[in-house]
Amino acid sequence: MKFIIKLFPEITIKSKSVRQRFTKMLQGNIRNVLRRFDEDARVRMDWDKLVVSSRNDQFHAQYLETLACIPGIQYFLEVKLSNFTDLHDIFEQTRAVWGDRLKGKTFCVRARRVGKHDFSSLELERYVGGGLNQHCETAGVRLKKPDIQVNLEVENDELYIISAVHHGMGGFPMATQEDVLSLLSGGFDSGVASYQFIKRGCRVHYCFFNLGGAAHEIGVKQVAYYLWSKFGASHKVRFTAIDFEPVVAEILEKVDNGQMGVVLKRMMMRAAGQVADYFQIPALVTGECVGQVSSQTLTNLNVIDRVTDKVILRPLITWDKPDIISEARRIGTLEFAETMPEYCGVISKKPTIKAVLSNIEAEEANFDFAILDKVVSEARYLDIRRIGEETAAEVQEIETTEVLAADEVILDIRSADERDEKPLVVEGRDVLHIPFFKLATAFGDLPKEQTYLLYCDRGVMSKLQALYLKEKGFDNVKVYRP
């Protein structure tokens, strides 16, 4: 199988040297991601495209899913690549691919040509289109809004017959821009904000301020791992977890109630700035949106930003909440956010919407900054690729098994699409299906006398979900790895 990768348009208008550098980086990124599951993946670089090929047709569906989620790809074409002798040979090859699919359909032929030939692109379109109309049971040629558009590309003596066109995610290739540190809470906003910078070519590292115990951290790790594995797996990134409960306790004791929200955000920015300094990251990313909550007025954001010299990037600053939720649904983080509790909102009962810097600084004078320094010094840094292994070592009581006992039930927690593509069949046993994003609410309704073995393809999500359920007090759960 072969695919032609078309570059994001903003790449094509760069200078020659920048374009070559971006294209070469995209080539490496595609190769890195595809070889996670197919070592035979090949990626060849041309001036205006990349050509991806593999002999392993069994990975076709994974190629389609993966290529659609790599930054820098505007769209990609499934192609049949061959040589040709003349116009009639091109027609015959095109009819072999498209003939049956044109039955009863209106169509047109669009051709793109590079190199020296004894025919023009228009002549190629007319010859092949006329031949298909004459020799196939079509509903006729329609140049505007046809049922099917047959796309051909001729490059010197090579013919590319395009059988399907798929949209990519656009943006710049990963690591063509500088790194950023995203303050990830697990909610709708921070996940979408992180995605925006992945798409723009930044390596997005994650900083998590834990306000809700192990369950909160497990939930946010799931979001970070999902974003990385889905859209950014070509490069390693770091996940930083900071226990912020001591900071919250100090704020509750020492800071005026109305100023608590702004002071908390300033403490988070201070801590994130130190983490960014440690990893030499020049910018922070948040999901803040002007006016969405009390701490996100322009006055308050200005006061919050004063505590760090890092650039604080807010890609959602003017987005409406319904648009953020819609984008979260599109990229796949909605289900995580819907089950993630909001911890920051309980801090202040009557929050200020126009913080005065001098008043905030006076309140912070009562704060013991040794507490902030301590929680940052004790921060835990994790290569996001190791999340599954780290969680397994962290909580020893989660049992993994490949053998089923009589009272054990297999619980497939994959999404419906993953399940349908690769069904789990265990001879003589039924398999229950509850997607991971519904497990937190649905698990308590299952019969408690049975033990449930959670299953997913790689074992990472099932391990994280088992940890979450253990934290909630459910002991009748294991991980199934056949």
Swiss-Prot record:
User: What EC numbers are recorded for this enzyme?
Assistant: 2.8.1.4
Instruction: State the reactions this protein catalyses.
Output: [ThiI sulfur-carrier protein]-S-sulfanyl-L-cysteine + a uridine in tRNA + 2 reduced [2Fe-2S]-[ferredoxin] + ATP + H(+) = [ThiI sulfur-carrier protein]-L-cysteine + a 4-thiouridine in tRNA + 2 oxidized [2Fe-2S]-[ferredoxin] + AMP + diphosphate; [ThiS sulfur-carrier protein]-C-terminal Gly-Gly-AMP + S-sulfanyl-L-cysteinyl-[cysteine desulfurase] + AH2 = [ThiS sulfur-carrier protein]-C-terminal-Gly-aminoethanethioate + L-cysteinyl-[cysteine desulfurase] + A + AMP + 2 H(+)
Which Gene Ontology terms cover its molecular function?
Answer: ATP binding; CCA tRNA nucleotidyltransferase activity; tRNA binding; tRNA-uracil-4 sulfurtransferase activity
Q: Which HAMAP family match?
A: ThiI
Keywords, A to Z, come to:
ATP-binding, Cytoplasm, Disulfide bond, Nucleotide-binding, Redox-active center, RNA-binding, Thiamine biosynthesis, Transferase, tRNA-binding
Name the record gives this protein: tRNA sulfurtransferase
Q: What's a single GO CC term here?
A: cytosol
Q: What is its main location?
A: cytoplasm
| Annotated disulfide bonds | C344-C456
User: Domain Rhodanese: where?
Assistant: 404-482
What Pfam families does the database record attribute to this sequence? Rhodanese, ThiI, ThiI_fer, THUMP
Q: Which residues form the active site?
A: C456
- Give, as in the UniProt entry, the pathway in which the protein acts: Cofactor biosynthesis; thiamine diphosphate biosynthesis
User: Which example biological process does GO assign this protein?
Assistant: thiazole biosynthetic process
Give the originating organism. Aeromonas salmonicida (strain A449)
